[in-house]
Amino acid sequence: MYKRQVRINPTGSVTVFTGSHSHGQGHETVFAQIVHEKLGVAFDSIDVVHGDTGRVPFGVGTVGSRSLAVGGPALMRSIDKIIDKGKKIAAHLLDASYDEITFKDGEFSVSNSNKFIAFSDVVGAAYVPGNYPIETLEPGLEETSFYDPPNLTYPAGAHICEIEIDPETGQIDIVNYCVSDDFGIVMNPMIVEGCLLYTSDAADEE
């Protein structure tokens, strides 16, 4: 089970608190990618906090390739909650009903009209509640979500190693090494390729 906390700061920057600690796998990059793609905020305005037990939420660590498969949905749930609250704020600001509001590319817009408001303006309204539905919504934009998968995931893959063995000395030399893995949805191809090459290079270690 993983917990993700997402905080939209008054400046419009985003802070993600995660209990899954990166050991070089690129969690910070991929989690920031998810926030960027879902909210449309600038990539360099997203800060991912991990490894600080005084600040981060509950998490079981990065084991069994679970950080994205399990932590990713928890992060997306928190973002969806923020978008949902943002739609309520936008509906108030645009004098529309909640059902009329859609969110895309960093903007809340009213269906079948040219009325819209930027995500940054909704954030500002959330923290300066002068024109805000204070009776029904608490100020601020910060959400937390848990995700516990209903079952385990098992990736499929095959590794084939061709070796030569010196019959006199017993010396083993790797001639060729082929890897085939099913990764599912790849968020960042460069990171996946790097992890794959690193694990393959480990075969040459002594």
What residues fall within each predicted segment?
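Phosphate-handling active-site elements
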Residues: 39-43
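Short conserved active-site loop signatures built around small residues
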Residues: 46
